[in-house]
């Protein structure tokens, strides 16, 4: 699991609330042992931004151990991260809660966690290529779920059902009936562009500019996504596909869909996290990704849908902007 913590608030682990089936009180918080320092370094430090300093730890033991690390972020704010370490032979350690909010067991791995302005954790799963998922306030949203890309395969039946699924456009690497069916039950709402709804014979059509509220505190807006370079317009024509902006209690994520830099990007407003496609000739070149990022100015940029594109120089080209390159999003 990858974790990125932003705008954190304090809470308390020592209230007898457990995770992974563990109940009972935590021990009194004290200094970290060498073993606990190693756990923190292995499970938390590589995946947490901003960098956290663990000051104390308390424990809760039963069929494994919960370690509640009491930390400080660079601004001096208190942050609590719970790591569950199972008994030998029962899997590896994992982060199970942040600031008292438990993370779902049946949510895809390879995820990051951001904290919204209300102090709630927002989990972002980087599944592969253009497939993403969000978990917030008990709701799960999937974007362009696809079961297979080349040798990469995902069994979506292993995950919990989605509350909503958003499809950007009807290309095979974004629209997959098998994945949609695996994630859906009678409560799942499907949103897509008109071509995808026609292909699936189900779903609610969203056109550029449409917006709505999925639940209290979760809003969505469909935004333009299209090619502009001469000769590429055939791949993604203007007005056909969508990008999406998701607003989670003020934390705004931009999922660009398949697009090149377009004028509309300058009108998106404040963006905390942006997913931009880098896969020429269908979407952006690396230099176009830089151009788009400079139009949007996200706090964090994650290139996705990038296939074999070499992204190693991208962070250097966007100094002052946090750039995360995630292998699964090829």
What is the predicted role of each segment?
Residues 1-8:
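Bacterial N-terminal signal peptides
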Residues 142-146, 162-173, 190-194, 254-257, ...:
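Active-site neighborhood of phospho(di)ester-bond hydrolases with catalytic His/Asp-centered motifs
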Residues 114-119, 131-170, 177-181, 229-234, ...:
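Pre-active-site segment of Zn-dependent metallo-hydrolases
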Residues 228-295:
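Active-site-proximal loop/helix segments of hydrolase catalytic cores
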